[in-house]
Amino acid sequence: GRLTAVHCSDLPRTKGTHGEVGLYDMPGDVIRAHVAAGWTYHSRICIWKDPVVEMQRTKALGLLYKQLQKDSTRSRQGMPDYVLVFRKTPSDEKAADPVGQDARQFPVSQWQKWADPVWMDINQTNVLNVRAAKEDKDEKHLCPLQLDLIERAIRLWSNEGDTVLSPFMGIGSEGFMALRCNRRFIGSELKETYFRQAVKNLRAHDDETVFGDLFSQVA
């Protein structure tokens, strides 16, 4: 039982590569693949992203002000991220424990905020340091996931002591936050430089925990 959460976005199509300028519906592919594999499409969260930052980073034609002045029929909105959530119905023999939220730690005001279909307050710069994992050919597409987004997913959909699985671990952001939220973690990653950085990040969390406990005892 339980859930899987997939972070994704639409993909840009370019004239040089695809013969046209537009967007490709990657989230739709993710939904169809999960449903075909027996998962239930459960929820979609839209993650707001600053279109000015996107324009400065990508120089996308549809976001340029000069394009608006020239021909606004080719202007478009910025591209948000999405978290797609899928639920697997458990069998009688393998039903997962429910995840119950304590009202003292998860008040109704917080739920009203997190139940919003658009999360406007995710800090896009709240990510693990990735400089050690960068290679020249990767710099354009390396995009670690925001830690506050990961924390919300872990707190919403798992209990303390549960195991969080990340089959595409990258530099270990999900694992870092899983440990910080008192969960266990299993991750896999094909790229060796990313894997080594993930190990460093997870060890850094362990060191941080050890030294934090030590200093609290001394204090």
Task: State where each predicted segment sits.
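Core catalytic lobe of class I
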Residues: G1-Q197, N201-A204, A219
